[in-house]
Amino acid sequence: MKITLLGTGGPRPDPKRMGPSTLVRVGFDNLVFDAGRGVAARLVQAGVPITDYAYVFLTHLHFDHAGGLADLLFAAWNMARNKTIHVYGPKGTEAMVRYLFEAYERDIWYRLSETVLTHEKLVDIRNMVEVHDVGAGLVVEGDDWRVTAADVDHGHGLGLSRDEWTCLAYRVESKGKTVVISGDAVYSPSL
């Protein structure tokens, strides 16, 4: 298991720090946790081709943690990726990705139409991305790894319940090694 911090910045742009994102390499799989600003470029800088990841896990749906998701998905698609990308996140993730596809519907149509001239093998991105709203418990298992989620409290003293503002931490286990990744969180017994 190899961990790479792709971005550790916050919601305010900083030329020295990209938005929150962590890459966990487990065997031949690249797992991306959070998709903050600049995640696609940082993934490539880390030596991972933009077409060589299959799993994205969002801790919560603040723009600084999920704002780079469109770039991550569309950049891989535009490079003729044709394998499924799985996106996991708290309640609302499915709706967010659906809205992204609606917002870029004309662009999707344009690029698919363009393949008649370029002869590229571009599949419809809407058929390439599987999105899963998840909660606490087992999220997904790979060949030699598994990811589970726990509900955590975001904090900031806003008084929002976990039902009103769902935040997740993820636990990656592989071959006796474990790493826990959380986005914004205050002390949470589940963590």
PLM features: what roles do these ranges have?
Residues 176-191:
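Active-site-proximal loop/helix segments of hydrolase catalytic cores
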